[in-house]
Amino acid sequence: MKKALLVVVLALFTLAVMPVVAQDQPFAGKKVVVVTQEGSAIGGPAEKYGAEWAAATGATVEVQRFAFADLYPKIITALQTGTGEFDVLIYASDWMGDIAGGGYVSPIPDDVKEAVEWDDILPLYRERIADWGGTTYAVPFDGDSHMMYYRKDLVNPNSPYAAEFKEKYGWDLDEPQTWTQYKQIAEFFQGREVDTAGVTAPISGVAEALRKKAQSFWFLMDRAAGYSKIPGNPYFFFDENMKPLVNNPGWVQGLQDWVDIYNCCAAPDMINFDVVNVRAVFPAGQSVFGLDWGDVGPITIDPNASVVQGLAGFGVTPGAEKYWDYTTGAWVDAEGGVNKAPFIAFGGWVISVAADSDVQDAAFDYVKYLSGKDLAGTLAVTGGTGVNPLRQSQFDNLDLWTGAGFDEESAKDYLDAIKATIDDPNAIVDLRIPGAFEYFDALDAGIAKAITGEADPQTALDEVVATWDAITDRLGRENQLTLYKQSLGVE
């Protein structure tokens, strides 16, 4: 009798527990395949926190990571051929035109927006970057824009070098506002022995990503922006008739500036740098300047990666004293002496679910987990994650940054530089139309020719324009123009 009673009790207990187990493991037996870039930046969090989500839900997560140069071809080939091999895509928002515009990803459901606290994401990212044709197809994972890093212990009016600098260049040594000033400071310090964390060693002027098939084209755009972005006019890559602007005198001057600074003031082997190198060289105290997304900031406070803790200054990228007005065919002196046009380069990494995924429910739940407000804050203040500030709460909560190791002054400086970039009325949003990858690949090739001396900047950019026109014609000029205007918010 006791045995029979025990069997009944165990059976009832099993029935009682089974729904709980099923509820706690809602995606048991389901596999979610994620595709993104290799390395600690972006790919690292996708894998680490994907494993946490899998343990909590019973699902299996496979994160496939590819070199950045290979990522777009891998994704677009899988989508266009209908292999169904990827469920979640973590990709450059520049590619939205091909990916969302091609109908390859699912709209973001309201429950996902609610779960990630959608309204906390800055309007730029939730309304423009995540949208295609009036529909939200992605969740912003990272807020990207370019910024300038500099050694504030060396570059300031009270610096030990200030008097010598002013005697040579005629202005007070301080955070540069123009590319001319940036070059003069870099030139002044190039090869000079300076003290960094108690060690005296020669320093380079600049560390920038110049390697072909990496991110060089985005850093050319930083320079071209000041010289060619007309205040109040949204057109930058193409004009209102889809004629490429990238070989006009403003763009040519930007490329010439880059050639000049490479020849005078570059860190050793900078021609082979991508952003990973910049994120090592500047925090190591080996350059006066660095250009990057927001990633360098948290690295500068990491005692395991940085010797410039408290010595790094953060600023909006420089502008130009004059800009080329393509509508009149003339140079214009900038109002106030500087035409600043900060660049929302890349626009950030976004997350979408493939329309042909057969595990949509699990895939969107993974997106919720990876894009949550609390995790976003943790990732933004952690060096090496590739995730930069994109939420209002991250700008409002200074304790988030001081708790991570920033001193209060540096935290404010860092956040102010990012916010000033995003909020600038003359800021440029990156190219997002179909073919963006191809357009940029052609520009990348032109930059390499100019930097190595194979062609002068004008000739190199003329060749780029010829290729851009061919891409536009192949994709359909009228349709490309319509989509380009839509991306700019122009009717």
What annotation goes with each model-predicted range?
Residues 1-33, 55, 60, 462, ...:
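Short, low-complexity disordered leader/linker segments with a strong preference
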Residues 33, 48-124, 128-131, 135-138, ...:
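Extracytoplasmic "Venus flytrap"/periplasmic binding protein-like
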Residues 49, 216-233, 252-365:
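Extracytoplasmic/periplasmic substrate-binding proteins
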Residues 296-307, 320-445, 480-485, 491:
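C-terminal lobe and pocket-closing loops
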